[in-house]
């Protein structure tokens, strides 16, 4: 009986520890339906961080699974004025500690520089940093797909 109680207690602790908040914040004045394009900014500005390089690949994939069409930095100048009005610049950040990993992806209007949406994915079992990171990436990807659903 003690063993079952101990096992149940451990599973409950793991469950509670993994319950971190993933959420999306959308600007009150933003109409996300107006946006069709996205471009990652500051590409290759990682200062040697392998985690950020890995995150960029996975964030790019997540955005491609939404309705937003990815546009490279060099291709922005080829967009028409109307297309630039539908363009979001994408910035992201990764924070990790022993308890959890957090991945935040911010979407900023190209012309105004105003943040219109921020998606946050967090995950933490505290057992394996890479596992927590992958969990946070999956959660932020889910938030992006919900925020910019395919039509």
How would you describe each model-predicted region?
Residues 20-33, 65, 116-151:
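C-terminal/domain-edge helix-coil "capping" segments
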Residues 1-19:
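Sec-dependent bacterial lipoprotein signal peptides
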Residues 14, 33, 83-85:
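Structured loop/turn residues at beta-strand edges in well-structured enzyme cores
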């Amino acid at each position: 009986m003690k063993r079952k109680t101990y096992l149940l207690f451990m599973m409950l602790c793991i469950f509670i520890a993994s319950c971190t908040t993933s959420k999306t914040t959308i600007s009150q004045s933003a109409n996300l339906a107006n946006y069709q394009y996205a471009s990652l900014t500051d590409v290759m500005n990682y200062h040697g961080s392998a985690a950020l390089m890995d995150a960029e690949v996975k964030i790019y994939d997540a955005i491609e699974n939404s309705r937003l069409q990815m546009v490279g930095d060099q291709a922005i100048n080829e967009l028409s004025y109307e297309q630039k009005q539908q363009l979001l610049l994408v910035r992201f950040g990764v924070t990790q500690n022993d308890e959890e990993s957090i991945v935040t992806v911010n979407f900023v209007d190209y012309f105004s520089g105003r943040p219109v949406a921020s998606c946050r994915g967090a995950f933490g079992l505290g057992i394996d940093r890479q596992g927590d990171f992958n969990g946070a990436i999956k959660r932020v990807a889910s938030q992006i797909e919900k925020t910019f659903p395919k039509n």
